[in-house]
Amino acid sequence: MKVSIITSCFNRAATIRDAIESVLAQDYNDIEFIVVDGASTDGSLEIIREYEGRISTIISEPDHGMYEAINKGIRVATGDVIGLLHSDDFFYDNGVISRIVEHMKTTRADFLYGDGLFVNPDNTDKVVRNWIGGDYRLWKVRHGWLPLHPTCYIRREVMMRLGLYNESYKIAADSELLVRYLMTGGLSVTYLKEYVVRMRMGGLSTDSAKRKKMLSLIHI
């Protein structure tokens, strides 16, 4: 099972190396790593290019935001399963992808999610919030629960069939996609009771007030 990991980046020179290194350190061999840079001006692209030959695909061109960049990555991906690692984040350890693949093979799931840690951006050893996904129930989605987006791994054919990220949402396109997939996709969903990712606090995607405002605009 090939896993495509997509990282979008714009002016993240301070953190992009951690993200890249955590992908390259994975002990699973069949990984396609795609980095989509939005024409960064802070040295991010120069850091990314240090890893040419180890990153499967590097795209650098202006875009209209993170979700357009992610969609570009998905369209060129060739993996059986697609996951995201944001440029501020890094994997929990080097066995994450191996455990994801094993669990998806065992359960034959279309969609997997796991647990995550929110960490202090200045001291990533300091955990700010421990996010535990818990067992999947559709009624939980109907009542506003969603899996933690950076822990989600989805079969590529599902994404091609159900559609990619809605680029008109500048903050919560990930939430719109998850609601759409889980509510209308008829998917086999599984929960991996393992930590997948460490997320630095402070980005738009971790601002709960802004996300709640955007979620109120989502219509399925």
Tell what function each PLM region has.
Residues M1-S208:
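Nucleotide-sugar donor-binding/catalytic module of glycosyltransferases
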Residues L215:
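Active-site-adjacent helix/loop segment of glycosyltransferases
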Residues H219-I220:
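Conserved small/polar residues in nucleotide/adenosyl-binding loops
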